[in-house]
Amino acid sequence: MQLHEQIANISVTFNDIPRSDHSMTPTELCYFDDFATTLVVDSVLNFTTHKMSKKRRYLYQDEYRTARTVMKTFREQRDWTNAIYGLLTLRSVSHFLSKLPPNKLFEFRDHIVRFLNMFILDSGYTIQECKRYSQEGHQGAKLVSTGVWSRGDKIERLSGVVCLLSSEDEDSILAQEGSDFSVMYSTRKRCSTLWLGPGAYINHDCRPTCEFVSHGSTAHIRVLRDMVPGDEITCFYGSEFFGPNNIDCECCTCEKNMNGAFSYLRGNENAEPIISEKKTKYELRSRS
């Protein structure tokens, strides 16, 4: 069967909420995620969001324009099949897929579907530009609620994809500056795990609205505090993620309480920011 026939078939036979298990290796997940964020997220936000391989170009300019058109149509018409087929038949994507075994075509397609869920009304959330964080040059992304959520709810169409990392994998993945956003330490498994997928866009807050719940090779998001449309979906990365006692934390709660990176504001409106000694890496965020 020719590749385009395979793409046509997998664009029809799919679940709009992909299975929670997967067989991706850490390297495959990095490439699949970079492609998915380029095709789906970047083409909507119109800037480059986080990437595991920052020097790689995934699409040519004409393909990027096509991806933007595909995503615009998807957001208007919610036609999953046309969106999947339109994205997977782009030259650069097809060339990448031609090197994969058949079972990995399904894995790649499912990863695209995870991100397409960001723009489905039923998902109850979406992605928006975020200019809060200096580590991102004040141009990043955030996930926000588009519906009403109650404590204990599971955000069904929002997930993270998890891969266990060997020490060799960890050294390779963390070699690139800024790629540590994607790595968490599992206290239960006592090892580092690669954390990508839509859930990787969840920002930290010291008073989070949600939490990560791990189950096997994925993690879902559970609501901790009631949310209404416009509320940001946030999780707690850890007490030392942004330096000792999160001294460099720039979250909304720290700004409100004048803690973390905003502690210089206490009692002195004219004070200058205190620049702590910067490390090349933040600490790994933790999960159970």
UniProtKB/Swiss-Prot annotation:
Free-text disruption phenotype from the record: Mutant animals exhibit a lack of di- and trimethylation (H4K20me2/me3) and an increase of monomethylation of 'Lys-20' (H4K20me1) of histone H4 on autosomes, leading to equal H4K20me1 levels on autosomes relative to X chromosomes. Decreased expression of autosomal genes. Increase in 'Lys-16' acetylation of histone H4 (H4K16ac) on hermaphrodite X chromosomes. Increase in binding of the RNA Pol II large subunit ama-1 on X chromosome gene promoters relative to autosomes. In a dpy-21 mutant background, RNAi-mediated knockdown leads to embryonic lethality.
UniProt keyword list: Chromatin regulator, Chromosome, Methyltransferase, Nucleus, Repressor, S-adenosyl-L-methionine, Transcription, Transcription regulation, Transferase
Major location (coarse): nucleus
Domain of life: Eukaryota
Transmembrane segments: none
GO biological process: determination of adult lifespan; methylation
Record-linked InterPro entries: Hist-Lys_N-MTase_N, SET_dom, SET_dom_sf, Suv4-20/Set9, Suv4-20_animal
Keyword Transcription: yes
A GO MF term: histone H4K20me methyltransferase activity
Disulfide bonds: none
Function: Histone methyltransferase that specifically di- and trimethylates 'Lys-20' of histone H4 (H4K20me2/me3). H4 'Lys-20' trimethylation represents a specific tag for epigenetic transcriptional repression. Contributes to dosage compensation of X chromosome-relative to autosome-linked gene expression, possibly by converting H4K20me1 to H4K20m2/me3 on autosomes. Involved in the regulation of growth and body fat metabolism downstream of the TOR complex 2 pathway.
Record protein name field: Histone-lysine N-methyltransferase Suv4-20
